[in-house]
């Protein structure tokens, strides 16, 4: 109404891109049954891109699987992440792909946004933001992924870097006075 100071919500058009009535009947994430991966996520797109072909042969990735890329600095982890994102959006267009960048340089964020498909969600928290923001953005992405899974969607989250997220959590918690290996406070 025009004379109201604060406008009220009149009707809901969509919930996570779907009909609001279907949202009422969704199964909540904690009630879902975890299963072992039984469908392979094919990453190879072109014969010239060897890294994704090698991943398909040596370390195949399946729906429902968690993985970790461990390599020294400047080894090409981010390049591999971009190739994986492009492969997933090409080979599995029905899956929702979210790229989470924690504590990255703004230039790196722009590079990844420009190098992936437009339907890929790139969510970032750059290095000039406080650690609380890194945690908040990461938890929002996790919640978004869980809501989409509740709507029976396949969701893939690619994250760079879990080390920096762990560091942000470590900076936010109050210190206990004890230190584990790697400078992590066990509080």
Model-identified regions with their sequence ranges:
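Acidic-enriched and Gly/Ser
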Residues: 1-45, 93
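Short beta-strands and strand-coil junctions in structured, solvent-facing domains, enriched
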Residues: 2-3, 18-21, 75, 96, ...
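Glycine-centered flexibility sites
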Residues: 4-5, 64-67, 71, 76, ...
């Amino acid at each position: 109404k025009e004379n109201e100071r604060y406008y009220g919500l009149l009707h809901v058009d969509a919930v996570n891109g779907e009909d609001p009535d279907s949202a009422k009947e969704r199964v909540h994430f904690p009630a879902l049954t975890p299963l072992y991966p039984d469908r392979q996520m094919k990453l190879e797109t072109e014969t010239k891109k060897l890294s994704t072909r090698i991943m398909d042969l040596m370390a195949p990735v399946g729906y429902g699987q968690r993985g970790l890329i461990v390599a020294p600095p400047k080894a090409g982890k981010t390049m591999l992440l971009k190739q994986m994102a492009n492969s997933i959006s090409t080979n599995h267009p029905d899956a929702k792909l979210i790229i989470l960048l924690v504590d990255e340089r703004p230039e790196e964020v722009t590079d990844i946004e420009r190098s992936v498909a437009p339907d890929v969600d790139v969510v970032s928290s750059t290095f000039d933001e406080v650690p609380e923001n890194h945690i908040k953005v990461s938890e929002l992405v996790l919640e978004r992924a869980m809501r989409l899974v509740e709507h029976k969607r396949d969701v893939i989250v690619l994250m760079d870097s879990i080390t920096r997220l762990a560091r942000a959590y470590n900076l936010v918690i109050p210190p206990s006075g004890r230190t584990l290996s790697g400078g992590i406070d066990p509080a």
